[in-house]
Amino acid sequence: RYVMGDRCYDDANDHDIERMASVTREALKAGALGFSTSRFYGHLDKAGNLVPGTHAAAKEMLAIGGAFKGLGHGTIEIISDYLEDDDELNWIEQIMRDTGRTITTLTAPGKREKIWQLAEKMSQSGLSLRPQCGARPASILMSLEGTINPLAIFPSYKAIRQLPLDERIAHLADPAFREKIKTEQPIHHRNPDAKRFTTSYDEMYPLDDALSYEPGIKDSIAGLAEARGLEPLDVLMDTLAEQRQIIFFFGGYKGNLSPYFDNIARAHSVFGLSDGGAHCGVLCDASVPTYMLSYVARDRTVADTLPLEFIVHKMTQNTASVFGLNDRGVIAPGYLADFNIIDYAKLQLEPPKMVYDLPGDGKRLIQKANGYIATIKRGEVTFENGIATGALPGKLLRGGT
């Protein structure tokens, strides 16, 4: 859109492509860490259109990739629904061979095996293709306070939605109100995903007390209802009235996270995004690093844990190197003194919590953790026992420095 304006949904002409490449190179010279593109059908603008660039031609992508030539830094990030298409993989490979730059792509278990094959092929040529792996499936947290509430499709609940939380909980304890909910026609969202995460009770899981994020199939709202001889809607209302979060997994969750951890253990993988702010009332994955250290490396009993040292390396030096941040991730002379001091036996997440501290009393999910004795940045203590010290030694990151 920056280059093409209102024509951004049209095919780019030669002048547009040349300008995009020029802007990319200018940004890289100014210190940009790289270039990112979305070719994913889930990314829409506010009008419901696919974001510009979703269908950008290979010619356009190759020209932008060419902007990296000779600079010696910069990473290319690609989110694509086409990673099983040979044409897509061909231009990705060509950019890597032309520029020598690292490319990282989003992937998921059971899909896109071709990207892993290409990653191995590239490594044999001394090139780096790094598929990104999430520690957990893409998910949302639903609750009475959350942006997404599965009861909001019922007219009777809509009528009380603006009441204080304690009054809504009282309504959910009222047999007459519950019966009214169960007998009325829900108003479904036209978006298939939105309808799915308000009606698919076999894909809704109350967040367990251990915060494992790894429930068994029997632990779903539907599974609990069957075990208790109740209707799923009754279990849903009970769970929400108890102020428990309900997690909904996208991507076909199969009852454990082993496929995700198996991907993380692959040689060419890199940890993917753990979103802590973009979807304030919907999820809080800023807890993922603590989750990996505590649950995946220590507390997991469903299947094997991953070695603690491996997880620390994957989250620090291994990830930093993908973006050319080669001054961190190791405790050694010449590196930034960035590290946490942890009481590992006490390292534990707290449940997600909704707070109202954004402008206009806006809400956001937070998730605190215990066990961090100190966080040190550039040799200065920035947090001590979870409390900010006021020290702000961080600096603006620039690529190529």
Language-model segments: residues:
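Gly/His-enriched, cation/cofactor- and phosphate-binding structural elements
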Residues: A297-S321
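Ligand-binding pocket scaffold of soluble enzyme catalytic domains
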Residues: G329, A374, L396
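Active-site neighborhoods of metal-dependent hydrolases
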Residues: R1-D14, M20-G66, I78-R300, D304-T305
